[in-house]
Each structure stands twice: as structure tokens, then as C-alpha cells.
């Protein structure tokens, strides 16, 4: 702030405020000067008395100037003995000189010799800076020149003048320290530590004299500590010298820039426990040394991941109301959000899905809590209520406010009566204040503008019209009651009366009393004339006397409102503040100590003018980035990231891959769970409209083969209405329709654990549809053929479902009321022994084994019958366990044959024995055909030991027939060559074809 602005600020303040600020500054000055004594103080009353005494001594009312010398002096503590100069080395090397310089700078040593005498004679003030002495011997100090003394005196005088100017400006204002303020002697002492000046009367010593001086310096360095101790004691005894030694002078240049000083020595800091300080000193130090934290860097645009939480004016706010976790668990079980969200007509966002997932997590937690509670492992403390995200995000309506008020009235109905009483009391007090103080206590509002002249004329004409019209019904009544003969006479008199009444009305408005008397007389006359007529009509109808309503009250009898008192704002505020019940207190009413404490409090900053400034930003820092406030309506999150160095994304939006995008490599065609084949015969086709097909394709592109989400989006309707079979949209039905619409669909594209079941289901459905000649697959209906057929099919399916339900209810077994129910015999029941239980288990296992054998035998007989008829095709589905090609002579293949899987094919376990036995079935075949068939039969029996020999021979014959003629001839040649030698030569690497090779060759044909 500039000096001009400060002058304006001080000029605008009153003298009382300036005196109060001066008192605060004096209290702070006293506390800072006594900071060393206040650390261990316990009696706060004594401190308050001392502060009051100090303020009384330096008050401006008594016209006493401030005596700076009377202030308490800041005396630093003595340096501990371990930090004193050690005298291990007797040589005055440059490193020791530097060390001594630093140690002597921290000590309170006053200048000795002639300098002490000069200081005592001058009586300098306390705030004058102390010159740091050089490390010199006693001889060099005595031989200092008079010029240095004169320069030192002149520099001290300049410093004293500057300090006086500084005090004259402000007690707290500080002048900038420049290099010119430092005395030249000090600069010379630091910059030239080795040069010694001699007086004019004394000549410079020779080389021999220099040697003697060096020897004397070495001798003096041994006794340096004792001399300094004596100097310290001398300084403490002299009050003036101690006053001058209260402050130290700091050199203008750093020590690293001085001549012959390259590196300073730093002693280790002694470790000590921090002493507790009084609360007043800590608060003052915190206020002085506290710096404002920068919560927002406006110029720094390269801030990465900087999160700022900005509050609104009404923060902190009330948290949203919570619900018990049991209620949320019940709602999640009855109406889960995962089922309700897809039925909404709005867009499906990530927040909605996260809300549903959080609800499921809460359900799991609640079930775990219930389990622990049953096991007596859960505490009896009530768990924290969870805020329902649905009710918290809904806007508050008038109905919600009424419900909240009703709930509050239910809790405490009598409190509403107290609230009404308090409101009435407040209104009564406001009325009393209005009639006591006048319009001063009223709220200042904008005055109502006076009406224009045109509006006044219209209003006056309307008033006259109403007055005249009020007489018209009386005239009509009189005319109707009077005879026709008297009508002419009465007409003129009535007109005159009307004119008189109008004149009387004008006169009465001006405040004349004659008008009122005339009205009274006319009213009496009117009553006398109409008494007879009213008596006749009173028996017939009850009437109202209008004359009494038109009668005007005498203005003299009107109640005149008393005049309001006129009071000034100062008087009103003074009377209001004199009340014993107040919410605030003025600082002037406190004592000096109380005012100092209240000003130094850091927590209660409402009394400070800086805190009243609403434009200053309030720091709000979250504990973590992952923690956000629960009340999101009153908090905003701003995220700043570095966007200067980042290049724009070169990948177009169409190529970006998200969680539900179908162009991701991890999104394969995974079919849903296939329905059971048991109900395939009773399956009805589903009808798909063109709009349904478009929505299906859109959902598939959006959710990437997530059939559960696709089904929930397709079946977006209420659960209460009836849905027929042809209108259902299950995940499998959506997948079926996708297979129909996709022309490039291939069964091999399906992946996942459910792909095999889906392939079987599609194959069986296609086969059944060809056999029954009835449609099972979904049916696409165009817009032209949908008018009647679709509706008819839907109603037909509805009636079919009703018929099945009625039939099922009729066929259900009904209890026979005539047959008595046998009582449950509990006495004859006996608990089985362990032996009986083991026998029952053995019998059950035996029955299961017998059933398995029967089923296996029936299956084998069925396969043999199919082989004999030639109906069983040679496919992997009918014979998936046929042997594979392997080396028949390898030992490893024999070992693998024992542990083979259905895809592995073990070789023959023995050598083939070629015999000359002719086949019994067909004599046209070669002689070695039987051996080939037997070899195949042995392979089949070796792989499937549960096969019978007949079934193996039939399978071998079928395999041989499926071979081409060239392969059969080659096999016969191989077997003929094998029959001659007993040992197969190693050069022969030909082996019999495996069933897998046979299948591949058959498929190639």
C-alpha cells in the first residue's frame, strides 16, 4: 500500500480508533519484548497488571512521551560452555580465524578499551546496532588508530539518526537497509581481516617486530577463553554497554564473497527439547509468521491432475437423509435397480449402472452383517445409514415439504404450538417497538408513488356515482308504495330531496355539521312517512333499514390515532444495545488483556475485517482425490490437466474402442444359454416386426453380443401386463433372430463354453422342423401382413395359455375328504444304526451300477441294430471315439493307448497273424480281407473294452467297406508281404489307416 493510501486510511479513522490501534501495538510490543520471560509464566493476572501499568505510563492523555530506555531489553541467553572456543591448536591459521569470527559473532561481547569509554560518554540508545569485533590481540586493540574511532562514531551517529526517523514514521514500519547504512569500519574489518592500522605517532614494525607480534598472538590465543569470560562479566556489569550490545550488526555482503574466506565452519546444533510456550505468545507468533496458502495458480496452465473443491455460499450444507440398511436390502430384493433401469424410457448411462452395482454391493454387505449377527459376531451399535442415491437426487417438491412438516409434527406436536407462540411474541414485540420508537425500527422500503390527477378525478366521480345510486332503490320503493295520484307531487319533492342529499354529502365531506343534522331530520321524516307502509310489508317480508346504514357518524366522535414518536437511529441503537441479552460484545468493553487475547485468537476470526470480505477465496482442500462430498448439489469439482504439450488424438471417433463396441478383438460371438431340448417339440415361433429387427441390430452394435442387456432393452414393458409366447424377447430368442438376419453367420464363429450346446440346439431344431413340417424358428412379419394376423396369433396364444392353465388345474389331484388321514406314528420309528446305514448305501450303489449296465447294454444293442441296417452314418457324432493313426511298433504309443482320451488312437497291442482262413460272409473278397477286418476289430476292442466282439467286427467291416478300392488292394499287398517274414523289416513304415483318416477321405468324396 502506498503512503498516500495509508494517509487516506488513517485520515478517515477517528481519534478513538487511532488510540485503540496504538494500545494494541503497545501491547504487542510489550509481549514481544518479554517473550523470553513469558515462556515459563504461570500467573496471567500479573501479566495483565504489568501490561496495564505499561499502558498507563505511556498514555497520550497524560502528555508523557515514550521513553525507549524504559522498555524491557531483549537479552539473549548465554552461550553454553560446549560451544565456546576450544584451545586445542595454538597456531592462528586462517581456518581458525574464520571459526573464531563465527563464534564471536554469536556472543555478547562489548568493545573494550577506548571504544567502551566513548560509548559510555555518548550514552547511545538501546536499538543501536553493535559492531562485531575482529579477532585481534590485546596489542592490536591498543594500537588502533584514531581515524577508525572517528569513522565509527560518525557511522553510529548516522545510524542513530536513521533509527529516530524510523520511529517517527510508525512503530511497526521498517526502513529498507542499504549498504550505505553500514559503518565503513565494519566493512573494513570484514573485508581486510589481516591489515592493521597504526597511529601516526607510531611507525610500522619491522620484520623482526612482526615475528615478535606473531609469537605474542600465539601466546594470547591460549588465554583467549578466559579473557572473553572476563569481558562478558564486564559487559554484564555495565548497563550502558549491555544496552548497546542488545543488537548485532549484519554485514552487507555474504561471507562467501569476503577476501581470504573460502569456506565457513559450521558447528553442529545441539539437540534440545522444545519448551512449551504460553498460548498468547504462540497465537501472536502464528499471526505474524502465518503466510497465505495459494490454493489456485491462475498463471500456471501446466498443472497436472490438480483437483480443487469449490464450495458455494451456503456450504456447509445439511447432508441428505439416509435409510436403514435393512430397508435398502428389502428394496433391492423386491425391486432391484438392475431390473428397473432397463425399463426406463431415458438413456442408459454409466451412473445408473454404477448405482445398481452399488445397490448389489450393499445387499451383499447387509447379508454378511445378518450372518455375523446370527453368529453373535456383530456389534450392537447401529450401523451408519446409507444415503439412497435415488431419493437424494430427486428434486424437492411442495409435497415433500408437506410430508416433512407432517413427520416433524408427528415427532413433537407441542413444539408447533411453541413455535406459533414464539411467532406471536415476536410480532407483539415488533408492534410495541413501533409505538415506542417510531418508524426507526421499521424496514426501509420503497415509497409508493402518489396517484396522478386523472386517476383522482375518476375516483371522485365514481364516489359520487355510488352516493347517488344508493338513493335510487329508496326512490323506487317509495314510488311503488305510493298511489299513482300522488306520483307527480312526490316526484318534484323527491328530486329536490336528491339534490339536497347530494349537497349535504358534499358539505359533510368538508367537515360541516349542518349536513349531518339535515340527514338526521330527513331520515326521521322518511321514517314517519313510511311507517304505515313498512308495517304492512313487515308482516309479509323481513327488510333491512338502509337509512341506518347511510347514517354518518359525527366526525367529532372519531378516534384519532396518536402521533408516532420521533427518535434518531443512534438513540434507538443505544437503547437496543443496552439490553442485558445480547449476541455480541464490543472490544472497548473488554479489559486490555481481554482485548489483546481476542485480537490474537486465530480461530475466531469473525471480528476481523479481513474475514468479513466475501470476495476472498476460502481454502477447501479434500483429504483425497477419491473422496468426494456426499452432497453433490453444493460442491463442484474442477479438474485441471496439462493440455499444452498434449497433441490432439489422431484416432477418429469411429475407430475408438470402448467397453460395448463391437470392433474390439475381445468381443467374440458368444451365444447365451440354450434352452432345454425337452420342450423343443412344443415350441412356438416368435414374431418379429421390422421395427423390432432394427432395434435388435442397434442394441447388438451398442452392447456387443451382451445378450442379457439386449434382451432387457428389447423387453421394455411393464411386468404386470400379459406377454404371449410370440412376443417374448429372451436372450436366446434374440440370438436366434440375429442368426437369421446375419447372412454371413458361421457356426465356427461361436466361442465360449456355451457354443457347443448352441450348435446342438440349432442342429436339432432344424432337423425337427424338417420332420414335423412345422415352423419353430422366429418369423419375420412385414408391415403389410401385420394388421390381423399378428393380433389373431397373440390372442390365440393367450387363449391357449388360459386353456392349459385350466386343464392343469382340473387334472391336479384333489384330496379325498372321505378317506381319514392316518396319524403319524412316532413311537414305532427307530433310528437306523451305522451298520444299517452302510447296508442301505451299498444297496443304493448296487442299484445304480445295475441301472448303468442296463442302459449301456440297451445302447449297444441299438447301435448294433443301426449298423446292421446301415443307417448309422460314419460321423464324429455317431463314432467320436474311433482310433487315430499311430505307429504300431512304438512303445510310447502303447503306453498312451492305456491313458488315451476320446480323440487319441492307440495302435495294435500285438502283431497281426495272417491266416489262410477264408471269410464266411463273402467268398469274392481276397483271402487277407478277414485279417484286415480283425485288425480293425482288435483296435476297436483295445480302445473300447466295453464293446462286444460282434459289434467290433461290424464296425471294422463298415470301415473296410468305406475304403476305396486302391487302398484295399494296397492293404492286401502289405499283409501278403508281412505274412512271409516273421519279423517286420524296419524299412516298412506303412500302417493301417485310422478311423479319422477314413472319415476325412469319405468326406472328400
Swiss-Prot record:
Residues 386-460 form the HSA domain. Residues 171-180, 198-209, 481-490, 874-890, 915-926 have a biased composition (Polar residues). Residues 75-85, 519-539 have a biased composition (Basic and acidic residues). Keywords: Activator, Chromatin regulator, DNA damage, DNA repair, Nucleus, Transcription, Transcription regulation. Pfam families: HSA (PF07529), Myb_DNA-bind_6 (PF13921). PROSITE patterns: HSA, MYB_LIKE. One of its GO terms (cellular component) is NuA4 histone acetyltransferase complex. It comes from the Eukaryota. Signal peptide: none annotated. GO terms for molecular function: chromatin binding. Component of the NuA4 histone acetyltransferase complex. Component of the NuA4 histone acetyltransferase complex which is involved in transcriptional activation of selected genes principally by acetylation of nucleosomal histone H4 and H2A. The NuA4 complex is also involved in DNA repair. This is Chromatin modification-related protein EAF1. It comes from Kluyveromyces lactis (strain ATCC 8585 / CBS 2359 / DSM 70799 / NBRC 1267 / NRRL Y-1140 / WM37) (Yeast).
Amino acid at each position: 500500500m502506498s503512503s498516500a493510501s495509508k494517509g487516506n486510511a488513517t485520515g478517515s479513522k477517528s481519534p478513538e480508533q487511532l488510540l485503540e490501534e496504538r494500545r494494541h501495538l503497545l501491547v504487542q510490543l510489550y509481549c514481544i519484548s518479554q517473550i523470553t520471560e513469558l515462556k515459563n509464566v504461570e500467573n496471567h493476572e500479573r501479566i495483565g497488571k504489568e501490561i496495564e501499568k505499561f499502558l498507563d505510563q505511556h498514555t497520550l492523555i497524560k502528555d508523557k512521551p515514550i521513553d525507549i530506555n524504559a522498555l524491557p531489553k531483549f537479552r539473549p541467553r548465554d552461550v553454553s560452555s560446549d560451544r565456546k572456543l576450544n584451545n586445542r591448536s595454538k597456531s592462528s591459521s586462517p581456518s581458525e580465524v574464520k571459526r573464531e569470527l563465527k563464534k564471536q559473532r554469536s556472543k555478547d561481547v562489548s568493545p573494550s578499551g577506548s571504544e567502551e569509554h566513548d560509548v559510555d560518554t555518548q550514552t547511545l540508545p538501546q536499538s543501536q546496532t553493535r559492531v562485531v569485533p575482529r579477532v585481534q590481540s590485546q596489542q592490536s586493540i591498543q594500537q588502533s588508530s584514531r581515524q577508525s574511532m572517528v569513522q565509527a562514531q560518525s557511522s553510529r551517529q548516522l545510524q542513530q539518526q536513521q533509527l529516530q526517523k524510523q520511529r517517527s514514521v510508525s512503530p511497526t514500519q521498517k526502513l529498507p537497509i542499504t549498504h550505505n547504512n553500514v559503518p565503513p569500519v565494519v566493512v573494513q574489518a570484514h573485508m581486510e581481516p589481516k591489515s592493521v592500522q597504526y597511529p601516526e605517532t607510531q611507525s610500522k614494525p619491522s620484520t623482526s617486530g612482526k615475528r615478535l607480534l606473531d609469537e605474542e598472538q600465539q601466546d594470547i590465543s591460549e588465554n583467549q577463553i578466559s579473557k572473553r569470560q572476563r569481558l562478558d562479566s564486564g559487559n554484564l556489569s555495565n548497563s550502558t554497554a549491555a544496552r548497546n550490545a542488545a543488537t548485532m550488526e549484519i554485514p552487507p555482503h555474504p561471507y562467501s564473497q569476503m577476501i581470504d574466506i573460502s569456506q565457513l565452519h559450521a558447528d553442529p546444533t545441539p539437540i534440545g527439547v522444545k519448551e512449551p510456550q504460553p498460548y498468547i505468545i504462540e497465537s501472536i507468533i502464528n499471526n505474524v509468521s502465518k503466510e497465505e496458502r495459494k490454493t489456485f495458480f491462475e498463471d500456471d496452465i501446466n498443472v497436472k491432475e490438480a483437483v480443487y473443491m469449490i464450495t458455494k455460499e451456503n456450504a456447509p450444507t445439511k447432508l441428505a437423509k439416509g435409510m436403514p440398511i435393512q430397508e435398502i436390502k428389502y428394496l433391492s430384493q423386491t425391486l432391484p435397480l438392475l431390473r428397473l433401469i432397463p425399463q426406463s424410457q431415458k438413456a442408459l448411462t454409466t451412473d445408473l449402472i454404477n448405482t445398481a452395482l452399488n445397490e448389489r454391493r450393499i445387499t451383499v454387505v447387509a447379508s454378511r452383517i445378518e450372518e455375523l449377527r446370527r453368529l453373535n459376531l456383530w456389534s450392537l451399535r447401529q450401523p451408519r445409514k446409507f444415503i439412497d442415491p435415488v431419493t437424494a437426487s430427486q428434486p424437492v417438491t411442495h409435497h415433500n415439504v408437506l410430508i416433512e412438516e407432517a413427520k416433524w409434527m408427528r415427532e413433537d406436536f407441542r413444539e408447533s404450538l411453541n413455535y406459533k407462540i414464539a411467532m406471536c411474541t415476536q410480532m407483539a414485540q415488533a408492534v410495541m417497538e413501533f409505538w415506542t420508537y417510531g418508524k426507526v425500527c421499521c424496514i426501509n422500503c420503497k415509497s409508493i408513488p402518489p396517484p396522478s390527477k386523472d386517476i383522482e378525478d375518476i375516483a371522485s366521480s365514481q364516489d359520487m356515482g355510488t352516493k347517488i345510486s344508493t338513493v335510487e332503490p329508496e326512490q323506487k320503493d317509495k314510488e311503488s308504495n305510493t298511489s299513482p295520484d300522488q306520483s307527480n307531487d312526490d316526484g318534484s319533492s323527491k328530486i329536490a330531496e336528491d339534490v339536497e342529499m347530494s349537497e349535504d354529502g358534499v358539505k359533510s365531506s368538508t367537515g360541516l355539521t349542518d349536513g349531518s343534522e339535515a340527514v338526521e331530520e330527513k331520515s326521521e321524516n322518511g321514517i314517519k312517512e313510511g311507517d304505515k307502509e313498512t308495517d304492512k310489508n313487515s308482516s309479509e317480508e323481513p327488510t333491512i333499514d338502509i337509512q341506518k346504514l347511510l347514517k354518518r357518524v359525527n366526525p367529532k366522535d372519531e378516534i384519532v390515532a396518536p402521533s408516532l414518536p420521533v427518535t434518531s437511529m443512534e438513540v434507538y441503537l443505544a437503547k437496543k444495545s443496552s439490553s442485558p441479552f445480547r449476541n455480541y460484545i464490543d472490544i472497548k468493553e473488554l479489559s486490555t488483556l481481554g482485548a489483546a487475547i481476542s485480537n490474537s485468537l486465530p480461530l475466531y476470526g469473525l471480528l476481523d475485517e479481513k474475514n468479513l470480505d466475501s470476495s476472498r477465496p476460502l481454502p477447501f482442500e479434500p483429504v483425497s482425490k477419491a473422496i468426494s462430498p456426499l452432497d453433490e448439489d453444493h460442491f463442484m469439482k474442477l479438474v485441471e490437466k496439462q493440455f499444452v504439450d498434449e497433441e490432439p488424438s489422431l484416432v477418429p471417433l469411429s475407430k475408438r474402442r470402448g467397453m460395448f463396441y463391437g470392433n474390439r478383438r475381445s468381443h467374440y460371438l458368444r451365444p447365451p444359454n440354450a434352452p432345454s431340448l425337452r420342450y423343443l417339440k412344443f415350441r412356438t415361433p416368435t414374431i418379429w416386426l421390422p421395427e423390432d429387427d432394427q432395434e435388435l441390430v442397434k442394441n447388438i452394435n451398442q452392447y456387443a453380443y451382451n445378450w442379457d442387456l439386449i434382451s432387457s432393452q428389447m423387453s421394455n414393458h411393464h411386468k404386470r401386463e400379459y406377454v404371449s409366447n410370440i412376443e417374448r424377447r429372451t436372450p436366446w430368442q434374440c440370438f436366434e433372430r440375429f442368426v437369421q438376419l446375419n447372412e454371413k453367420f458361421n457356426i465356427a464363429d461361436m466361442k465360449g463354453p456355451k457354443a457347443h450346446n448352441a450348435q446342438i440346439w440349432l442342429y436339432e431344431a432344424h432337423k425337427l422342423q424338417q420332420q414335423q413340417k412345422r415352423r419353430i424358428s422366429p418369423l419375420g412379419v412385414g408391415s403389410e401382413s401385420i394388421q390381423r394376423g399378428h393380433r389373431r396369433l397373440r390372442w390365440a396364444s393367450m387363449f391357449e395359455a388360459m386353456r392349459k392353465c385350466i386343464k392343469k388345474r382340473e387334472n391336479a389331484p384333489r384330496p379325498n375328504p372321505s378317506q381319514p388321514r392316518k396319524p403319524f406314528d412316532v413311537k414305532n420309528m427307530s433310528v437306523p444304526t451305522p451298520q444299517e446305514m452302510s447296508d442301505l448305501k451299498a444297496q443304493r450303489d448296487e442299484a445304480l451300477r445295475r441301472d448303468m449296465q442296463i442302459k449301456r447294454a440297451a445302447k449297444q444293442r441299438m447301435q448294433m441294430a443301426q449298423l446292421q441296417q446301415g443307417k448309422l452314418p460314419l460321423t464324429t457324432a455317431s463314432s467320436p471315439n474311433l482310433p487315430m493313426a499311430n505307429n504300431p511298433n512304438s512303445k510310447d504309443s502303447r503306453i498312451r493307448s492305456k491313458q488315451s482320451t476320446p480323440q487319441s488312437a492307440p495302435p495294435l497291442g500285438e502283431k497281426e497273424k495272417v491266416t489262410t482262413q477264408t471269410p464266411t460272409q463273402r467268398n469274392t473278397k481276397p483271402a487277407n480281407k478277414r485279417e484286415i477286418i480283425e485288425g480293425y476289430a482288435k483296435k476297436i476292442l483295445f480302445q473300447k473294452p466295453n464293446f462286444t466282439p460282434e459289434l467290433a467286427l461290424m464296425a471294422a467291416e463298415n470301415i473296410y467297406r468305406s475304403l476305396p478300392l486302391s487302398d484295399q488292394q494296397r492293404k492286401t499287398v502289405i499283409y501278403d508281404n508281412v505274412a512271409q517274414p516273421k519279423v517286420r523289416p524296419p524299412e516298412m513304415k506303412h500302417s493301417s489307416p485310422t478311423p479319422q483318416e477314413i472319415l476325412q477321405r469319405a468326406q472328400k468324396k
